[in-house]
Amino acid sequence: MSLASGGVPTPVCEPGRPWPMGVVPALIGGRAGINAAVPAPHATAVELCLFDDEGRQETARIRLAARTDNIWHGFVAGPGAGQRYGLRVHGPWQPEAGHRFNPLRLLIDPWTRSLSGPLARLANEIGYRASAPHQACAHDNAERVPRCRVVDIAEELRAGAAIM
């Protein structure tokens, strides 16, 4: 484990699998952890940001290790069900071409099965300045975005807690 900029630890990320989409519990090579698979065809990098149990403090920022076709993916041994996380995606800022990549914006995984945190003002979280839509927003929004939570669907079903 090394330290990324800002002193956030960076666990080792292995290639993992490009499926299923989202961040899910996984057993790869006999080790338990989480596998992330995020389609982002125009991205230059995708980061998985892990947070503490309350979702307040970022505990690790992990650059996904592999890309298969248009899917960025990686496996991190250790974390499992209940882990809170978000995504950051790097790429071109070209609004005229429909590309508004902004790694200062913490994103919600569209495949997450659980969110924790306030949703009331979520519609205000855009990656550009409202008064100047062709300029990227220069402020990190992590403190205002709900955290995704890794869910073990099989365990939820065994416990009778999953709603399908």
Specify the residue positions occupied by each region the protein language model found:
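The feature marks proteins involved in alpha-glucan
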Residues: 1-30, 58, 67-71, 75-164
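Structural beta-strand segments of beta-rich domains
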Residues: 32-36
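Short proline/glycine-enriched turn/loop motifs at strand-loop junctions of beta-rich domains
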Residues: 39-45
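Beta-strand signatures of extracellular beta-sandwich domains
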Residues: 47-49
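Ser/Thr-rich low-complexity repeats and stalk/linker segments
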Residues: 62-64
